[in-house]
Amino acid sequence: MDVIIIIFIVSAAAAAFYLYLVFPTRVSKEQREIFANRCYAHRALYDNKTDRPENSLPAFEAAMRAGYGCELDVQFTKDKKLIVFHDNDFLRSSGVDKKVWELTYDEIKQIKLFESSESVPLFSEVLSTINGREPLIVEIKAEQLTNEWYSELCDATLQMLRGYRGDFCVESFHPVVVRWFKKNAPDVVRGQLVNARRSSPNIDPIIVFPVEQLITGFLTRPHYIAYKEQDRNLALRIVQKLGAMSVMWTVRTQERQNELCKAEDAIIFESYTPAPFFNKHG
C-alpha cells in the first residue's frame, strides 16, 4: 500500500511539474476572435514566377484584396534597418551569396527578387501597404543570436508595431525572442514556432527537443503554438487543452486544410487560394 501511495505522489508531482513547464498564456475571447478561424498567406499571396514574388509589396496588396491575413518575416540588415525577407541569404531569391546581415539596406534594395522588378521592402513599407486591413503574423528572424542583436531587433520591431494601427501577433523559433516579448510587451499576442526533430535533422536534438515538446513554455508562456503541419504531437494537444491557440504551417492543398481545420485555430497556406475564413468544427 505504501508503495502505491508513493507511486501516486511521485506521478502527481511529475504531472504537476510538466504542466508548470508547458502551461501557456490563455488566449482571451477577444484575441481568439481576431486571429482564429483564418487563413494566413505565407509570405503574402505570391507567385515567384511573376512580378508578385514572396514578401513583396505587390504580394501583400494581393493578399489584402483577397481578404487574407498574412504571415511575414522580419530581420535586421547590417545597418539595422527592418526588412521583410525570409532567408538568411539571397542565394535562393536572387543568386547573391551574401547574408542579410552582411549588407546595408541601400545595397539590398539593388537586389531584385526572383528575376522580377521587385526588391526587398522595408517593414514600414509593408505596414503602410497593409494599413490595418487584415491581421498579421510577424515572425522575427534572430539568426544573429547575440544578446545585443536580438534585443535591438525585438525592440525595433515592437516600436514599429506600436505605431501601427492594425491587428498583429509575433512569433519566433527562438525561445529567447518569445521570452523578450513576454517580459517587455506582455500584452502582445506571442507564439512559439516549432520544428520537430524529424524536420530538423541538421540541428542538435538537444536544442530541438525542449522546443518540440514545449517545455520551454515556463520561460515564454506563449499564447499560441505554430507547428509544421506534419509534426502535430501530444504536447501540442495538451497545450491546446490548456488554452493556447494552434497555428499550422505551411498547408499547400485545400484537401489538407480540410483535414487540419477541424483541430487547428489558424492555417498558414501557400500554393492555393482558400476562402479567407473557415469553420473549425466542420
Where are the regions that the model predicts?
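Phosphate-group recognition and catalysis centered on beta-loop-alpha active-site segments
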Residues: M1-G282
